[in-house]
Swiss-Prot record:
This is Chaperone protein DnaK. It comes from Neisseria gonorrhoeae (strain ATCC 700825 / FA 1090). It comes from the Bacteria. Residues 628-642 have a biased composition (Acidic residues). The modification Phosphothreonine is found at residue 200. Belongs to the heat shock protein 70 family. GO terms for molecular function: ATP binding; ATP-dependent protein folding chaperone; unfolded protein binding.
Length: 642
């Protein structure tokens, strides 16, 4: 059975795990780290760096280094959250032809799924290196509060990376899975998973029940904010530093992309240090310059100051907790355990706020960086048939419905409904002899249709002429286990039907995905070719160095014609390694090897002669040593003076 890997595709960091025979393992990446920064850099020559290598060069290549692409996934360019991010990101966010928020790097227009696919591909390669076999299937996690188009876009990213996404599961649910399966007891418990990651916040109330030795994880309610996370905490600190520097020096660092990138790194580091210390210092020499010369940034930040900067962000995470508990029909006293997930949940003030709200200490025995990937891997093993002791009952985070007369939203599926699920409702025409209807699919909680998220629309035509209100049009909503919606409409009079798998009112078309898959495959092929070229070049250069050294040592012992032949081959090989033609490099290296055969024989003969001479000298020395040995008897003399 093919192995199904679990991937936590995070805003700031991503993590990979595999579960086999009930044992879960977090897989290290090529650099040996258990998490990978979700950072992608596009270089001049078409090369793409992912993770730590991309992060290391971010300051010098700020405009082409993309981070937090997950915050753009499934979003329109005009969305207010995207507009807010445009001001603070050093790279360029653009409006795609379909109205989506895309990114421009090295002159190329890139969709967020395409960028995220680079991270997924790195995860895939790490899994293949660890398992020693090809990996094509994965479970990928998303924030519980992701809407339909964001889920679809994440699935598209998997496809572009060459992965068959077997299931999209919610991050808090995955963390609950990791926590619940780790607990050996069979106690039923209700848990709250507070997940404050790099870019998104989720709260899920989950009931873990023991059913004859199997564990059932039922999500009772979920809530959240897809634009609240560690990146926002960093940004508050960055904005504060920029304002203070402007007051002191009169220079606005917002206009300098290189300075912004350095500030981002420094703010992230300072934030982490303030989780354990009371004060930290930000020191950035030569941050910028003006007519008077270079300017240096040195600033002390206390934990209290940082907490005051982000106080409202922490408060923003508590309101969804209140809503989720209410939706689940529970009070804080009903919660047995509070689990913290996501790197930002390490902040002491966040932990204090969670403790104050739930009235109990959050558990510290769950790794906030790895729990989500571990849960995804467990679900992967379930889907591959490797285990059957787990049942997952997740929910849809937002209500789903259609726009009806008067611009209102009529809900067919309420939020927090267990998925997969199906619902149907009969509607009719608004005018006499109406021959077609437009089904406008919406997601959200507002009564006014325009205030909700538009997921897409489709038409049902050829309706038989009839007075208004007479035709019967049955609309069916079907949500699969990934939380992705399929909608169909049927005229009960004529039997005519139309349907749509929601791709969002924007999203990537099938043709675009296919093109991106091909691009990604071509990139992988290019990477392979580059690796082979570098290997050939290294071999050729090692041979050139060796021949040059031998020629310097033994060239005078060769006849002129032989020496000339080697020097000509040497020159051709040196020219070849300057180019990018692997075949030419291999051919010239082989020609050099053949031409220098005689020289090699001389080197070998000389080395052999020296070895023999060395052995002879050693034998003589040994014999001489024996000649100097004197046989003698020793008499013990006692010292009476002791």
């Amino acid at each position: 059975m093919a192995k199904v890997i679990g991937i936590d595709l995070g805003t700031t960091n991503s993590c990979l795990a595999i579960s086999e025979n009930g044992q879960t393992k977090v897989i290290e990446n090529a650099e040996g780290a258990r998490t990978t920064p979700s950072i992608i850099a596009y270089l001049d020559g078409g090369e793409i760096l992912v993770g730590a290598p991309a992060k290391r060069q971010a300051v010098t290549n700020a405009k082409n280094t993309i981070y937090a692409a997950k915050r753009l996934i499934g979003h329109k360019f005009e969305d207010k959250e995207v507009q807010r991010d445009i001001e603070s990101m050093p790279f360029e966010i653009i409006k795609a032809d379909n109205g989506d928020a895309w990114v421009k790097a090295q002159g190329k227009e890139l969709s967020p799924p395409q960028i995220s696919a680079e991270v997924l591909r790195k995860m895939k390669e790490a899994a293949e290196a660890y398992l020693g076999e090809k990996v094509t299937e994965a479970v990928i996690t998303v924030p519980a509060y992701f809407n339909d188009s964001q889920r679809q876009a994440t699935k598209d990213a998997g496809r572009i990376a060459g992965l068959d996404v077997k299931r999209i599961i919610n991050e808090p649910t995955a963390a609950a899975l990791a926590f619940g399966m780790d607990k050996g007891d069979n106690k039923d418990r209700k848990i709250a998973v507070y997940d404050l990651g790099g870019g998104t916040f989720d709260i899920s109330i989950i009931e873990i029940a023991n059913l004859d030795g199997d564990k059932q994880f039922e999500v009772l309610a979920t809530n959240g904010d897809t634009f609240l996370g560690g990146e926002d905490f960093d940004q508050r600190l960055i904005d504060y530093i920029i304002d203070e520097f402007k007051k002191e020096q009169g220079i606005d660092l917002k206009q300098d992309v290189m300075a912004l990138q350095r500030l981002k790194e420094a703010a992230e580091k300072a934030k982490i240090e303030l989780s354990s210390g009371q004060q930290t210092e930000i020191n950035l020499p030569y941050i910028t310059m003006d007519a008077t010369g270079p300017k240096h940034l040195a600033m002390k930040i206390t934990r209290a100051k940082f907490e005051s900067l982000v106080e409202d962000l922490i408060a923003r995470s508590i309101e969804p907790c209140r809503t989720a508990l209410k939706d689940a029909g529970l009070s804080t006293g009903d919660i047995d355990d509070v689990i913290l997930v996501g790197g930002q949940s390490r902040m002491p003030k966040v932990q204090e706020a969670v403790k104050d709200f739930f009235g109990k200490e959050p558990r510290k025995d769950v790794n906030p960086d790895e729990a989500v990937a571990v849960g995804a891997a467990i679900q992967g093993e379930v889907l591959s048939g490797g285990r059957s002791d787990v049942l997952l009952l997740d929910v849809t985070p937002l209500s789903l419905g259609i726009e009806t007369m008067g611009g209102v939203m009529t809900k067919l599926i309420q939020k927090n409904t267990t998925i997969p699920t199906k619902a149907s409702q009969v509607f009719s025409t608004a005018e006499d002899n109406q021959s077609a209807v437009t089904i406008h699919v919406l997601q959200g909680e507002r009564e006014r249709a325009s205030a909700n998220k538009s997921l897409g629309q489709f038409n049902l035509g050829d309706i038989a002429p009839a007075p208004r209100g007479m035709p019967q049009i049955e609309v069916t909503f079907d949500i699969d286990a990934n939380g992705i919606l399929h909608v169909s409409a049927k005229d009960k009079g004529t039997g005519k039907a139309a349907n749509i798998t929601i791709q969002g009112s924007s999203g990537l078309s099938e043709e675009e995905i296919e093109r991106m898959v091909k691009d990604a495959e071509a990139n992988a092929e290019e990477d392979k070719k580059l690796t082979e070229l570098v290997a050939s070049r290294n071999q050729a250069e090692a041979l050139i160095h060796s021949v040059k050294k031998s020629l310097a040592d033994y060239g005078d012992k060769l006849d002129a014609a032989e020496k000339e032949k080697i020097e000509a081959a040497l020159k051709e090989a040196e020219e070849a390694v300057k180019g990018d033609d692997k075949t030419a490099i291999d051919a010239k290296a082989e020609a050099l090897g053949t031409a220098s055969q005689k020289l090699g024989e001389m080197v070998y003969a000389q080395a052999q002669a020296e070895a023999q001479a060395g052995e002879g000298a050693q034998a003589n020395a040994s014999a001489k040593k024996d000649d100097d040995v004197v046989d003698a008897d020793f008499e013990e003399v006692k010292d009476d003076k002791k």
